[in-house]
């Protein structure tokens, strides 16, 4: 039997979403360039989604998109658009309009199921360019994570080693997930889409043992020891 020419499969990709709050193209370009300079391994030439929910009706999509593209980023879609005129301009430019998913609300009255939480265990170093994804489970890494490496988990992430890469917990939208690390020096830390770049982590906790979680939807950090 001959193999079909194509095959559709589900997959997971890490995409940064840029929430634009200022319609001035030059301000947007400068702000993005500053972010890229701080985390070049994560953002340089990266694919991004532009969220335009914070923009007014008179926004020029052509000027805005050119400002983003001038930084070297690649726009792969646009979200948060409710203005019909802006939608038309985006569609004419050949980009898709995306709907950002939300984590399902948990029923307060529902009795939690007594099921064991799965855990993926990695005992070897995670090197630059590698991506580890723990689908529907927690992730434990007992070795170092190099810059340019990426850890993704739908659950919690534990790193018992030097963390220099990127860690994204609660990837499916669970805001109750946490990140635990014994030596925290990451390029990026994210929980349920809320993230910090390296320069946003308090200097007093860089290289130290720390726990990160969400409090009222805001990323927070606490010393472990």
Swiss-Prot record:
The keyword Cell cycle applies. It holds the Pfam family MinC_C. Keywords: Cell cycle, Cell division, Septation. Gene3D superfamilies: 2.160.20.70, 3.30.70.260. It comes from the Bacteria. The keyword Cell cycle applies. GO terms for biological process: cell morphogenesis; division septum assembly; regulation of cell division; regulation of cell septum assembly. InterPro entries: CAP/MinC_C, MinC, MinC_C_sf, MinC_N, Septum_form_inhib_MinC_C. PANTHER family: SEPTUM SITE-DETERMINING PROTEIN MINC. Belongs to the MinC family. Interacts with MinD and FtsZ. Cell division inhibitor that blocks the formation of polar Z ring septums. Rapidly oscillates between the poles of the cell to destabilize FtsZ filaments that have formed before they mature into polar Z rings. Prevents FtsZ polymerization. NCBIfam families: minC. This is Probable septum site-determining protein MinC.
